[in-house]
Amino acid sequence: MTYHHLSVLVHRQAEKYGDRVALRYRDYETAQWIPITWNQFSGTVRQAANAFVALGVEEQENIGIFSQNKPEWFYVDFGAFANRGVTIPFYATSSPAQAQYIINDAQIRYLFVGEQYQYDSAFSIFGFCSSLQQLIIFDRSVVKDPRDVSSIYFDEFMAMGEGLPHNEVVEERTARASYDDLANILYTSGTTGEPKGVMLHHSCYLEPFHT
């Protein structure tokens, strides 16, 4: 099957593989590997996509992800892609100054943060990022700063998409999606100067499957 955009990939795989395992993640509290099926993956991505619409995310908007590797990262990626959004990953060890530079350069409104370090770093520079409106926290164990009145947890974000209230908007955006849409901006480490944003389109990921 030929794909023109990453937004459709998870759902087509779910149609094909259903309840087969798509990925596993490690629960460090129980030391168990937790499976996620293709159907679960697809359903969660659809819910995340609807939550993005509820949040007010626009097509081609830049969404930041400042986190360790987590399954939530996939849901944000593919949920954003369904809205023709662009995701921008941060190094999990980025300093507050590095995060501030990327947020301001990419004009990020919504930043997903993983654990306590990422949250603390992002909150410390919130007031220096004119575009930044909200942090969305993956890990429920993260303790929010008492002064923080805008951040929400990931489960609260996902609740905004429960029941797929904006699915018609999502489907319209996905229908407009193009092979040449921007998928990610990857910032370099900045060891020889300010980080540079490398622009990767959906075609960069999909072309290897076509050859």
Language model features with spans:
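Conserved AMP-binding A3 loop
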Residues: 35-39, 175-176, 183-207
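Conserved AMP-binding/adenylate-forming core of the ANL superfamily
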Residues: 23-78, 95-100, 153-158, 162, ...
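Helix N-cap/beta->alpha junction signal
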Residues: 67-69, 115, 139, 181
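Solvent-exposed alpha-helix faces
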Residues: 46-50, 107, 116, 193, ...
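A short N-terminal helical cap/helix-turn-helix that marks the beginning
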Residues: 2-24, 43
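Conserved pre-ATP/AMP-binding loop-to-beta segment of ANL
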Residues: 18-21, 136, 152, 162-187, ...
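Conserved S/T- and glycine-rich ATP-binding loop of Class I adenylate-forming
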Residues: 63, 80, 111, 182, ...
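Structural core segment of the AMP-binding/adenylate-forming
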Residues: 82-160
